Amino acid sequence: MAGPNGDPHVLGGGTGDEGDEGGDTFEEEEYAAINSMLDQINSCLDHLEEKNDHLHICLKELLESNRQTRLEFQQQSKQLNTGADVQGSQPPA
């Protein structure tokens, strides 16, 4: 477990074999807890990466759709302007 400053607790050196075994068990449990937390963080990051990839694809599709719409509006505008120019240059009947 981490201390108040985020530093890992370091057990003081024991004088007997029994203290050392307890320290080893504590370290193993701490490493197992850290590994579990890292696995959870990794899983969350994978999930965020998938969401980011999905959003990136959606935004690219939206951008392409907007480009197509803009081109269509430009073509329609040119056709309307060309039609108005042709009608405007003809003498009234």
From Swiss-Prot:
Keywords: Cell junction, Coiled coil, Cytoplasm, Cytoskeleton. Its main location: other. Pfam families: UPF0184. It is found in: Cell junction; Cytoplasm, Cytoskeleton. The keyword tRNA-binding does not apply. It comes from the Eukaryota. GO terms for molecular function: molecular adaptor activity. Belongs to the UPF0184 (EST00098) family. Essential for intermediate filament organization in intestinal cells, interacts with intermediate filament and regulates intestinal lumen morphology. This is Bublin coiled-coil protein. It comes from Taeniopygia guttata. The lineage of its organism: Eukaryota, Metazoa, Chordata, Craniata, Vertebrata.
